[in-house]
A protein has these predicted regions:
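Positively charged, small/polar-rich N-terminal and surface patches that mediate targeting and assembly
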Residues: 1-89
Length: 89
């Protein structure tokens, strides 16, 4: 057995879950998290004032799979979570 931990963008969760179900992986633990990497946050406007948002919302997926499914699961997660933008990891 192997444990896979993946950090993805929140809006990709359904797509990743569906892709995992297609390869018969249905047990996933989902945790909401905040973090930053090269993105370093962003600025938002709220009621006329600017605020720095240092931490960006993320989703942490923890998945335990049989050894023979590990490579395929990692490939499926990588492909289905891909956006082509900074923060993909």
């Amino acid at each position: 057995m192997k444990k896979i931990t993946a950090i993805i963008k929140p809006f990709k969760l359904d797509e990743v879950r569906d892709a995992l179900q297609e390869i018969d992986i249905s047990g996933v633990t989902v945790t909401e998290a905040k973090g930053f990497g090269r993105q370093k946050g962003h600025t938002e406007l709220y009621r006329g004032a600017e605020y720095n948002v240092d931490f960006l919302p993320k989703i942490v997926l923890d998945i335990v799979v049989d050894d023979d499914k590990c490579d395929k699961a990692c490939e499926v997660i990588t492909k289905s979570a891909y956006t082509g933008k900074i923060g993909d990891g």
